[in-house]
């Protein structure tokens, strides 16, 4: 097309990809908890002196899938993202 300006193509770094083990398909459509505050999440377990893999916004609805009474739990959001985050930031719906 004439007069169309296209942005320069950019290749994302490998860490921009979500590991297949951290995606649930189909994603959940019913939720058990909501995050009361914005908080980080991790793909491969609790942090070991490394930055978080992402952050949930306050109000994000999730399904609580694994909780063994400790500081962290495993949840899935509406996009099927299966991650570990702090349990204390969750509120039951």
Which residues make up each language-model segment?
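Beta-loop motif signature
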Residues: 18-70
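Structured surface patches comprising rigid loops and adjacent beta-strands/short helices at the edges
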Residues: 87-93
């Amino acid at each position: 097309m004439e007069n169309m300006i296209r942005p320069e193509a950019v290749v994302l770094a490998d860490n921009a990809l979500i590991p297949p083990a951290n995606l649930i398909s189909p994603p959940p459509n019913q939720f058990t908890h909501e995050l009361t505050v914005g908080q980080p999440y991790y793909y491969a377990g609790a942090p070991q002196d490394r930055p978080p893999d992402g952050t949930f916004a306050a109000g994000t609805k999730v399904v609580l899938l694994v909780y063994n009474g400790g500081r962290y739990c495993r949840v899935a959001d509406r996009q099927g993202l299966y991650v570990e985050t702090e349990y204390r930031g969750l509120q039951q719906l």
